[in-house]
């Protein structure tokens, strides 16, 4: 894992859920958790990052709403700054669909919240 990827995983960890790269979620994972898909970009480039939080249980709706509020505080309108070994990033909300509410296609009891971010990388 690169310094950028680890820094983003740690940043998203501030949402108080375990964070896994998409496709690498351990079989023994329990709800709730967050999956993350990171694009690759060279320094001075920008890339899209998608994080999806998944919830199951009686409080899934309330937990999902609380996470959405927390994500809006973590990534304010003006963006958030992140530094890591060898570089830095500005993290912004991606367009008009920053947060999208989801239901799992296989199990309608599983609720999700997709968070889309635009990340601009800088060389330090």
Regions found by a protein language model. Name each.
Residues 1-23, 37-124:
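Charged, amphipathic alpha-helical segments and their flanking helix caps
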Residues 25-27:
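Short, glycine-/polar-rich solvent-exposed loops and beta-turns at beta-strand/coil boundaries
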Residues 29-38:
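A short, hydrophobic beta-strand-centered structural micro-motif
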């Amino acid at each position: 894992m690169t310094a950028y990827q680890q820094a983003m995983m740690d940043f998203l960890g501030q949402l108080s859920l375990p964070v896994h790269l998409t496709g690498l979620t351990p079989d023994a994972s329990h709800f709730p958790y967050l999956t993350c898909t990171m694009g690759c970009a060279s320094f001075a480039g920008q890339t899209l990052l998608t994080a999806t939080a998944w919830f199951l249980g009686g409080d899934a709706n309330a937990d999902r709403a609380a996470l959405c509020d927390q994500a809006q505080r973590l990534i304010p309108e003006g963006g958030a700054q992140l530094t890591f070994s060898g570089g830095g990033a500005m993290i912004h909300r991606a367009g008009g669909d920053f947060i999208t509410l989801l239901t799992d296609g296989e199990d309608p009891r599983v609720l999700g919240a997709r968070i889309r971010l635009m990340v601009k990388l800088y060389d330090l």
